[in-house]
Swiss-Prot record:
Organism, scientific name: Zymomonas mobilis subsp. mobilis (strain ATCC 31821 / ZM4 / CP4)
Cited function: One of the essential components for the initiation of protein synthesis. Stabilizes the binding of IF-2 and IF-3 on the 30S subunit to which N-formylmethionyl-tRNA(fMet) subsequently binds. Helps modulate mRNA selection, yielding the 30S pre-initiation complex (PIC). Upon addition of the 50S ribosomal subunit IF-1, IF-2 and IF-3 are released leaving the mature 70S translation initiation complex.
UniProt similarity note: Belongs to the IF-1 family.
Gene Ontology CC terms: cytosol
Name of the protein: Translation initiation factor IF-1
Keyword Manganese attached: no
Lineage of producing organism: Bacteria, Pseudomonadati, Pseudomonadota, Alphaproteobacteria, Sphingomonadales
Superkingdom to which the source organism belongs: Bacteria
SUPFAM superfamilies assigned to the protein according to its UniProt record, in alphabetical order: Nucleic acid-binding proteins
């Protein structure tokens, strides 16, 4: 999939789930399941409840996404 096809949205982590998954509430009040991107895992960036994050969504499945950035 080309990178241009991904949708980027901001959201807030509302729940930590097993297997490094997170429930994220997007700006438009939709809730999705998100997992951390590989570079975030590699650099050991922690994501906690209440953190503001940037999520990449694919147009094929808008219920799951990849957390690519944690805002400070």
């Amino acid at each position: 999939m080309a990178k241009e096809e991904l949708l980027e949205m901001r959201g807030r982590v509302v729940e930590l789930l097993p297997n490094a998954m997170f429930r994220v509430q997007l700006e438009n009040d939709h809730e999705i399941l998100g997992h951390t991107a590989g570079k975030m895992r590699k650099n050991r960036i922690r994501v906690l409840v209440g953190d503001e994050v940037l999520v990449e969504l694919t147009p094929y499945d808008l219920t799951k996404g990849r957390i690519t950035y944690r805002f400070k």
